[in-house]
Amino acid sequence: MRYSKYFIHTLFEVPKEAETPSHILLLRGCYIHPVAAGVYSLLPLGHRVAEKIKAILREELNAIEGLEVTMPVLNPAELWKKSSRYYDIGQELFRIKDRKDREFVLAMTHEEVITDIARQFLRSYRHLPVMLYQIQTKIRDEARPRAGLLRVREFFMNDAYSFHPDFADLDAYYPRIFNAYLRIFTRCGLTTVPIEADSGIMGGTGSHEFMLESPNGEDRFVVCTQCDYRANTEKAQGLIPPVKYSGDAPPPMEAVPTPGIKTIADLMRFFDCPEDRLLKTVAYEADGELVLAVIRGDFSVSATKLANHLKAVKVDFAPEKSLSARGLHAGFLSPVGLHGVKIVCDASVTGPAPFVAGGNAPDVHYRNVVCGRDFTPFDAADLAEVRDGDRCTRCAEGILRIRRGIELGHTFKLGTKYTAAESMDATYLDAAGNQQRVVMGCYGIGVERLMASAVEQWHDEGGMSFPYSIAPFQVILCSLGRKPEILEAAQALYERLGAHYDTIYDDRDESPGVKLKDADLLGVPIRVVVSQKLLQKGEVEIKVRRTGVVIVCPRDELLETLERIVADLQPSFEGLPFMPE
C-alpha cells in the first residue's frame, strides 16, 4: 500500500475536545473521526486495527469450539419485557417504535435474543453444551460519553454465550473462556489483570473482569501486596478492625442538643470521640422502598453492596421529599426509634461498643447508642467500601492498594437468570426424559475499547506504538529524497517487503522530518528507511518503534534481520494466571 494513495491525513494540533492519550492520538493519526458525542467513524487505519482484533477474537473463540452467529441490533420489546430488562434498565437503553406503533429496543447486549434461540433449538441434553458468539454493533445511550473510544454510544462488541446442562458443566467450561480471554488480551499486546468482579443482581457463582491498569480508567480495583487477591472495589472486602471497647456495659442512650453541628469533624470535636465511634446513617431508595444503611463513621457505604444484599435492581440516594414525608431530616438521620423503615447495618457497627448517632431531629444527636439494644436492624451485611490501606481478607497479612483501570472484558457465570420460568423459560430434556433448566454463561469484549487501550498502554511523546499483532501495518517504508536511484531502490524494497509483511510505503514528496514524525505518530511497529547515504553503502536503516532501537544492516540481509526483530515482538504467555482446565 502506498501512503500517497491511502486515506491518511494526520493532524499536528491536539483536538480541543480530546483529553486522554488514546483519544488525542487516534484523532491526530486519522484512525477515527467523530460523528456525534460518543459516536465515531473508524477510518481506514482504525478499521484495519479493528479487523485484526476481530481476527484474534475469532481464532481464540473458535479454538474453544465457539460458533459464530449474527443477531440483529433491532429487538422486539416483548423479548426484553420477558426478561424484565425492559423495565430494569434506565435511559441507557434506546427504546423506539416502528410505523405500526410496535415497540423495539436497540440491543446493548443480546441475552434475550440468544436465549430465545436456545429455547427453540437446544431441547435435548444431546445439544449441550454449546457456545455461540458474535461480533456485532452495540448501542447504549451513555449519559456522559468520554475519552474517545473508551466510553461510547455505539461500538463493536464480541459477546459470547454458553449453554450447559447444569452448573457443574458451566464450572468445568468457565476456565476455557477465562484462559481464552487471557490469550486474546496478551495477543493484542495488553497487560491484563484478572480480578474478581461483582455479580450484582444477576446472581450466579462467579464473575471476573479483565483490567488494564491505567490512570485514565474509570474502574477501581484492589490488589494485595502479599497474595494474589485482586477484586473490583464494588466486590472487595477489607479486614475491618473492631472498635476498641473494654469497659462495662455502656450507659443508657441519651439525647444531646447539638446546635450548629453539621459535619463529621464538628461531631468529633463536640463529643471528643474518634471517627470510628460515630454512626453514619445514609438514606437510599431501593426499587422505590426507603432503606437506611448504617455504617461506622470512618467508612463509606457501597451502594452496589447494598443493592446486592437487597437483591434490588435500582438503588439511589433517597430524595429529600421521601425523607420529609416520614419526618426525617438529612444530616440528623439515625436508626433509633424508627418503625416501618428497613434498616441494614454494616457488620462494623454490631457489637457492644456505644456510638454517637443522629437524633432524627434538627440539632439533636444521641450518645451511647448500641446496635441491638437501642435499635434493631432488619439485617447486617458487608456494606463498606474498601479503602486503600485496608488489610487483606484473603491472607490477613497484605495491604490492599487501590488501582485505576480500564475494563477490557467480563466473564460471567450467569446461571438461570434468563432461562428461568419467569424469564425466557429455556429448558431441555435430560437422558431420563426429565425437563431441566438450561444454565448459561455470558462473556464480553469491546473491540474499539481494545484499540484505545492498546494506545493507552503503548504511546510516547512521539505518538502511538501499536503491538505488532494489531497494528494497521507491520512495516512502514520511508524513502528520504527524490533522486531516481533512491526511488528505484525503495520500490524494489517495497516489493520484497510486501511479499512477507503488511507494508505501507511512504512515497510522498515530503521532507524527511515530516515522514519520520508521521511514522512515529502512526505507531507502525517497524520502520525501514532508504536514503542517499544508506544507498551508497548498500544498507538500510531499521527502527523498532516500541524500543527506539535503530539497526543498520546490508540491504540483502533486511528480511533476515526483520525476522529476528519480529520474533522479539511476539507476545509471551509465560506467567499468565491461567485457570486449570
UniProtKB/Swiss-Prot annotation:
SUPFAM superfamilies membership: Class II aaRS ABD-related, Class II aaRS and biotin synthetases, YbaK/ProRS associated domain
EC number of the protein: 6.1.1.15
Which keywords appear in this protein's UniProt record, sorted alphabetically?
Answer: Aminoacyl-tRNA synthetase, ATP-binding, Cytoplasm, Ligase, Nucleotide-binding, Protein biosynthesis
Q: Does the keyword Nucleotide-binding apply?
A: yes
- Localized where? Cytoplasm
Which Gene3D superfamilies does this entry report, sorted A to Z?
A: Anticodon-binding domain, Bira Bifunctional Protein, Domain 2, YbaK/aminoacyl-tRNA synthetase-associated domain
Q: How does it assemble?
A: Homodimer.
HAMAP family cross-referenced by the UniProt entry:
Pro_tRNA_synth_type1
Indicate what this protein is called per its UniProt record. Answer: Proline--tRNA ligase
Give the organism's phylogenetic lineage.
Bacteria, Pseudomonadati, Thermodesulfobacteriota, Syntrophobacteria, Syntrophobacterales
